[in-house]
Amino acid sequence: MAVKQTAGREALGKFAPKFAELNDDVLFGQGWSREDKLSLRDRSIVTVVALMAQGLTDSSFQYHLTTAKNNGVTKTEIAEILTHAAFYAGWPKAWAAFRMAKEVWAEDDAADAKAKHHSIPQIWEQIPPEPLCLPFV
């Protein structure tokens, strides 16, 4: 379910109230809420590719990468999406997009490394709590 957007009003409400209203209520409110037509995950993918194609790798691009991640796009998928889009949008734009995507998905790498470290059994966990006693026959 789409989250109610207020960033436009918070950033530009007094300076450009109509733009803020269109941003929050129309673009995000109406456009992103039509999940019966296109899922949030798919909208995120389309948005990331559209921004990359324009060469917009600013805070809005980072926001949409994070949104894509939160909407279920995996690191493997974003890498494939950006690689595929690079052939149509341009290699330099893809490089810029990858730099930001790498940052957004970096915490996954850290969590994976931590989980891997904790999944390796420690030597003392393999030692039985009491010594084995075999009966004499």
Model region roles, listed by residue range:
Residues M1-D42, A53-G55, F61-Q62, N70, ...:
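Acidic, glycine/proline-rich low-complexity segments that act as flexible tails and inter-domain linkers
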Residues D42-L51, F61, L65, I81-L82:
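Short, structured motif recognition centered on aromatic/hydrophobic residues
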Residues M52, N71, H84-W91:
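A short structural micro-motif
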Residues S59-A79:
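Mid-chain, well-packed structural core segment of small domains
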Residues T76-I81, K93-A96:
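Residues forming well-ordered secondary-structure scaffolds
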Residues I81-A85, M100:
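Short acidic/histidine-centered micro-motifs embedded in hydrophobic/aromatic stretches
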